[in-house]
Amino acid sequence: MCSSDLTNPFKLEGAVERVLQNFRDRELDALVAIGGEDTLGVAARLYAEHAFPVIGVPKTIDNDLSGTDYTFGFDTAVFIATEAIDRLHTTAESHNRVMVVEVMGRHTGWIAVMSGIAGGADVILVPEIPVDFEEVAESIRKRHARGKNFSIVVVSEGCELPGLTDAEERDQFGHVILSKRGVGDALAREIEQRTGYETRVTVLGHIQRGGSPTPRDRVLATRFGLKAADLAAAGDFGQMAALHGDDVVAVPLAEATAELKVVPREWYDVARAFFG
């Protein structure tokens, strides 16, 4: 089991110099940085500012790195979230409840959209699209009017809800610690107040990030690892292994971390077609 650390060396005095010195002291030839936007952002800066021999491998359940079609970890997270939504359907229907399912996704709603579509959610809320409480409530009311006395609402933890202020606590990358925000709870309260329907919350949290990976993620991680080894052997540093279509290719770390890959409006419209 590999350990991990969210320390940002560029935020700590002397930390970058220690990274460089430790690398030299151990007589290493290359570093493979495995992670998401924060980890690979640090890797990109180390390469750009210090010619550090680093290769990137995209690992994040958020699937929000623009340089690759998919990151490994994402498929597993979607599978876990979809299974949870499937299971919550039965208790929602038997108790005539609205079930709010909060999934991970700080800046983007890939997990919410994919698991919501796969699990048959009635409303899906993502950070890319502003949340309208009344629109959500009306969708649920319409279901009840048609005799559907239960609803499943999937919401990304990073959604901006009207009136919800961010918690003060942040990590070393400047991100709000989302577990302190309570997006799912705030949304559930609003739904219950506006509709009068009993509403419950399930926060999937870190269960999405652990356990056995799906076969797709296992294969993708293996392919990324092989590509990273080839790049290191060739001395082709400052690159990230990426999936483009069915091919694993190399893309510059700077390009891969320049911007986030957000959920396109078209994907959200696919999900929206099934709302209510």
Can you annotate each of these PLM segments?
Residues 1-3:
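Short, small-residue-biased leader/transition segments that mark boundaries at the very start
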Residues 5-27:
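A structured beta-alpha segment of the ubiquitous adenosine-cofactor-binding alpha/beta core
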Residues 7, 36-39, 57-63, 128-131, ...:
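Short, ordered loop/turn segments at secondary-structure junctions
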Residues 22, 30-35, 43-45, 50, ...:
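Accessory alpha-helical/coil subdomains and C-terminal extensions
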Residues 57-70, 93-94, 118-119:
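Acidic/polar active-site rim loop that often engages polyanionic ligands
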Residues 67-78, 212-218:
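Short beta-strand elements at the ligand-binding edges of bilobed clamshell
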Residues 169-181, 207-225, 229-233:
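Catalytic, metal-anchored helix/loop core of enzyme active sites in primary metabolism
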Residues 186, 239-276:
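Phosphate-binding loop/pocket of nucleotide- and phosphate-handling active sites
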